[in-house]
Structures are given as structure tokens and as C-alpha cells.
């Protein structure tokens, strides 16, 4: 089984003015596609051929892991975003955020701070621990919570290719705009699952 680039859940220009169509053209159309292509090339003729993406991420190492995890991470990230989104979550997710961080504002501050301080390339995540509590986790490079007991709920890509076209080296500015796009419906579904 070979993997294909999953369709975006919106048009490339739908996230403007926060994330440009040009960024999506490169980030999704080039970077994400390259991870898919590399993964297919690397798994051909191996024990990973025919396995699900999640199975590969949880059991592979080296180049196969890096490319599989980046395919999964990016696909998850695209679903964490939506046009005309943002705002704040409600219901059980809002209650869990308040229990873990004191308030939504405090969560947003801590998540943003973790993403800004995530050195180099990587991802910052909101995860649900096996005991139901929430935590903010930063991972480097292709690392992902899929390899841990925690369940990913939300992520932001802090590799420079995620924001360099629109914001150059100003990661904090990118993160400020990220909050206007967070798809809380997707995050809430992950939390409830």
C-alpha cells in the first residue's frame, strides 16, 4: 500500500490573512508531499509496506519514522486549523483546560510560550494523558505524542517552513495568528474520543 498526500480540509487560500496560500503551496504542496514521497520510497520492500501510518510511526526508526511521523503530524496539524475559527473552546474541553491551567487565557499563554521556546524545528502539542489530565508537550523534529501514552488534541508546527514566507523569523507573530485559526471542534472531538 502506498500513501497519498491527504486532501486539505479547506482551500489553500482559506486561511488568509493568517496563513497565505503561498505558504500552503510550499508547506502542504511541497514539504508534506515530500514526506509522503520519501515514506513510500523507504517502505517499499520492507516489513512496513502495507501497515497503517500509525503502526509505522509507533514502530519505525530513522528515516522511515521521520517521514511517517511528519506525514501524520502535518495531516493532524491541517485539521487543527480552520477558516473562520479561533475563539475559545466550550463544554468538557473548556472545563478540562480550566482544571489543568486555571483559565483559557493561562493555557494560551503557556502554549504560546512553549511553542516560542521550542528550540529549532518541532511541534508543540496539547495532549490528554491516560488519567484524563491535559498537558502541553513540545517535541523536536518529527517526534510525536503518538509514540507515548498521551493522546494528541492540538498541535502547532514550529518548523520554520510553517511560517517563514509569511512571518520570516518572527515565530511569535505566527503564533499570534495561529490562535485565530484553531479548530476547536476538531480539538473537542479528539478530547472526547
What feature does the model see in each segment?
Residues 1-193:
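Feature for soluble, non-membrane regions of globular proteins
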Amino acid at each position: 500500500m502506498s500513501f497519498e498526500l491527504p486532501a486539505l480540509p479547506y482551500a489553500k487560500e482559506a486561511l488568509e490573512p493568517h496563513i497565505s496560500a503561498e505558504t500552503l503551496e510550499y508547506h502542504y504542496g511541497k514539504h508534506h508531499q515530500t514526506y509522503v514521497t520519501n515514506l513510500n520510497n523507504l517502505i517499499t520492500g520492507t516489513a512496513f509496506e502495507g501497515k497503517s501510518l500509525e503502526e509505522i510511526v509507533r514502530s519505525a526508526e530513522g528515516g522511515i519514522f521521520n517521514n511517517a511521523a511528519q506525514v501524520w503530524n502535518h495531516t493532524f496539524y491541517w485539521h487543527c486549523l480552520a477558516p473562520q475559527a479561533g475563539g475559545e473552546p466550550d463544554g468538557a474541553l473548556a472545563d478540562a483546560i480550566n482544571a489543568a491551567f486555571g483559565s483559557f487565557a493561562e493555557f494560551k499563554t503557556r502554549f504560546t510560550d512553549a511553542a516560542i521556546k521550542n528550540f529549532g524545528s518541532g511541534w508543540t502539542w496539547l495532549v490528554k494523558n491516560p488519567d484524563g489530565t491535559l498537558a502541553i508537550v513540545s517535541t523536536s523534529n518529527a517526534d510525536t505524542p503518538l509514540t507515548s501514552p498521551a493522546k494528541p488534541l492540538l498541535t502547532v508546527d514550529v518548523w520554520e517552513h510553517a511560517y517563514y514566507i509569511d512571518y520570516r523569523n518572527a515565530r511569535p507573530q505566527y503564533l499570534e495568528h495561529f490562535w485565530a485559526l484553531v479548530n476547536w471542534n476538531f480539538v473537542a472531538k479528539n478530547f472526547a474520543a
